[in-house]
Amino acid sequence: MKTVIARTSSKLARTPRMNEEIVGFEDVIENLRKKLLSETKGQDVISIHGMPGLGKTTLANRLYSDRSVVSQFDICAQCCVSQVYSYKDLLLSLLRDAIGDESGSRELPDNELADMLRKTLLPRRYLILVDDVWDNSAWDDLRGCFPDVNNRSRIILTTRHHEVAKYASVHSDPLHLRMFYEDESWKLLEKKVFGEQSCSPLLKDVGLRIAKLCGKLPLSIVFVAGTLSEMEKEVECWEQMANNLGGPKLSSFLEDRVIDISRLIRLWISESFIKSSEGRSLEDIAEGYLENLIGRNLVMVTQRADSDGMVKACRLHDVLLDFCKKRAAEENFLLCIKRDQSTKAVISHKQQAHLAFSKMDNLVEWSASSSLVGSVIFKSYDPYFARCPLSSHAFALSHILINFKFLKVLDLEHQVVIDFNPTEHFYLRYLSAHIDQNSIPSSISNLWNLETLILKRTPAGRLNTLLLPSTIWDMVKLRHLHIPNFRAESEDALLENSAKLYDLETLSTTYFSSVEKAELMLRKTPNLRKLICEVQFLEYPNQYHVLNFPVRLEMLKLYRFNNSKVIPFYISAPNLKYLKLSGFYLDSHYLSETADHLKHLEVLKLYRVEFGDHGEWKVSNGMFPQLKILKLNYVCLMKWIVADDAFPNLEQLVLRGCKDLMEIPFCFMDILSLKYIELDNCNKSVVKSAKDIEEAQVEDNQNTNFKLVIIKKMILQFDISHDKEIDNAFKRLASLPGVDSISIDMIEKKLTVGGDMNANEVRLVVGKLIDSGML
């Protein structure tokens, strides 16, 4: 007989607040309401998951108390599980709602209470709210009490953990509750402070700023609104609040605005946080850890790749970030050095394991007294460097490193230009910095423990090919090598006799000058998973050559600048999932022949590719069997012939700037997996064919998930260095006639401006903003 589960509590399960007002999430509520009232006969569990403070419970309660929903059910009952709970109390809470009284049931054993609840629900259509479920076992304890007799009964379940939501789901997919939009943040703040009244126009600007500083989290907004409600409704008071929010509490949410996933994983590995497991790479294990944190909503995803949906960037909520920083300080793990913080002020902390600096001068000052520090991270952009000539702020790396005897990580990711002259730092595993030189000294091999080498280049430096010494092939522990436009300076015979870099997984962006050199380098890197390279072959053979890429290669990007040329080889990569070709001339048979060697390809992107044979591309039956995403950007393609059985699993088709193409093949009407077509700056005949495909997909195939997006406006992209004055830059750009969208991607360092605008005027203004150091 089951009496009490391992998690027990003497108090009744917490009852959610029923009258809490909710503002925002209107689209989410409508979507969930439809699921609750759908015609699906079987029992369905509507799972809502997300990080603490998003308003999962409030949202669930709004649905649970919605008259249009409740009126469709015979019985409504709820319970709140929490991390520590009593199984008996949960059953009593549900029985109290189901039968109106549970006073005579408290003395019954748990199994009889569960049976009573099940029999009460059995003949009726019920709506159950199970709030705050922490693990699968808690759901297992309750699910047997909810019978499924095909009468459209529904269960709303809230949890912080994605795995729990997925585990409990039946028909409907779990809903990951998003952060607030900016307008929702303001509406909630205004509602909480002013009630039914409107905010004074004098306070609106600062109010909008305060709402933005709350980090799009409803809980933070409610907390701040409570404080504002008790303050004078004066601009000065609200300005003070805004300034306070810019301090160490809520502003820490924005301290590291986004965390680049690739960088994070490389740092984890360099710090030895990831333990090896037979048959799995360290990168795969690290990705598993990250997915676990995301699934538990401890880490928020801020950006996914538009190609495959993989996480590209994330962030920590301010509460969790503050907790991590405090624990790190308590355990002597991390010390963040502020701009004006001297070594004297925190002398007792000099032997921290990791130091994070926001000013380069601090690093120079601290280097003399931090010999045991293992990691140094320069974590923010210093405007000083934007105002000075590059040569005036190049730091001699050797002078800094000589004092950090046991340094494992040196991450100067922002624009700190260093004089790269490596010394014998045997422990260094991770190095990221900017350089202003065209060659690397052979002494780089002294860093024989190095696993990650990222050398970004100044705008002037990018114009020249960077020469790497032959000693680079002696660095057998390298896992990730990222240097724009580089080539190895070595004789073929020397390279042939060098060691293989078995651990190297990512290589970008190397420069291949011949097929033979490409073959030789690929033989020396047998375990590559990601390769980005420029192809500038001097000779182009009359006959195609099959170039065998490493078996584990999953991502390949091949570029050619200047005039389009034929790729002198077919690509053979049995496990390749992602392929991007840019700046090449392809005859009509090239992709067909290559496709035979790419059976697992899921993403294909062609950028400024010119199709030969009168601009024709033929795709035969059965080609690209696993392809999900196809993007054609500014390709010279006039006639596209696709067999009926090609692209059988295609989900997305994107055409941008394909001015010569006359139509999308009609066989796309019959691709049942197709979900999305996007057209940008294409011919009217292409638009018409896309609309015909949309009609066939939606009406004939009943593909309700299909979406057609037609973009008519102009899009301009610019390379930028930073976004520290982005608000002022946005205001300047937004004032230009025709500009209706501005976005920034600091992972890719790209500014995008869109609208029906004067392109030359926009380019002129952006150029001035960059020159002035605002971008």
From Swiss-Prot:
InterPro entries tied to this protein: Disease_R_plants, HMA_dom, LRR_dom_sf, NB-ARC, P-loop_NTPase, WH-like_DNA-bd_sf
Gene Ontology cellular component annotations, sorted alphabetically: cytoplasm; membrane
Boundaries of every NB-ARC domain copy: 17-237
Coiled-coil blocks: 16-39
MF annotations from Gene Ontology: ADP binding; ATP binding; metal ion binding
Signal sequence bounds: none
Entry keyword set: ATP-binding, Coiled coil, Cytoplasm, Hypersensitive response, Membrane, Nucleotide-binding, Plant defense
Alphabetized Pfam families for the sequence: NB-ARC (PF00931), WH_DRP (PF23559)
Residues annotated to bind ATP: 50-57
Keyword Coiled coil in record: yes
HMA domain: residues covered: 711-775
Family statement: Belongs to the disease resistance NB-LRR family.
Note: This protein is encoded by the haplotype A genome of the allohexaploid Solanum demissum.
Function: Confers resistance to late blight (Phytophthora infestans) races carrying the avirulence gene Avr1. Resistance proteins guard the plant against pathogens that contain an appropriate avirulence protein via an indirect interaction with this avirulence protein. That triggers a defense system including the hypersensitive response, which restricts the pathogen growth.
Protein name as annotated: Putative late blight resistance protein homolog R1A-3
Organism: Solanum demissum (Wild potato)
